């Protein structure tokens, strides 16, 4: 049986796509109890060698029932280690929820240019902008770590 040039290109493209997805690793997504101004030890790994080490939230001061916008940002500092033997990029997303399950604030980030080298750790600062006025009511957070090619 003769394989056409088009067929060979399609097979090569599919094989490359599957290989890339396998090399990327799997999405790691878990929910935890929220605590402000405390370094939370997470220590969860995805199969590709990226480990979510710690999360620390920094909330600005409150005035009454709202966050004070002057002089402060709502930030999550997320430490990620690369325990593998190849440089890796990562995408991060984090969401805050109250005890009723309402979504209070979201932030995302990750590598823009340089990957995390093997056996190294990088700390990402994720800023919660837009909807975040009731973030101080958070009782839980969900964080997702997605390996990138």
Where are these regions (language model features)?
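Classic N-terminal secretory signal peptides
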Residues: 11-14
